[in-house]
């Protein structure tokens, strides 16, 4: 599963900033290939408004 940070974390609640960081994303446009697991899905779901997800 490929995730890309599409929106900034500036002004977001700290738990969302921490989740994006835990997913390995730092800057807008950063992409990362992650394993599709329930834990990762939950993290992605909590910040889905900031990410673009490709199967």
UniProtKB/Swiss-Prot annotation:
Gene Ontology molecular functions: structural constituent of ribosome
Keyword Ribosomal protein: yes
Signal sequence segment: none
Entry superkingdom: Bacteria
An annotated GO BP: translation
TM region(s), chain numbering: none
Assigned protein family: Belongs to the universal ribosomal protein uL30 family.
HAMAP family per the UniProt record, alphabetical: Ribosomal_uL30_B
Classification via PANTHER family: LARGE RIBOSOMAL SUBUNIT PROTEIN UL30M, MITOCHONDRIAL RIBOSOMAL PROTEIN L30
Subunit structure: Part of the 50S ribosomal subunit.
Name assigned to this protein: Large ribosomal subunit protein uL30
Gene assigned in the entry: rpmD
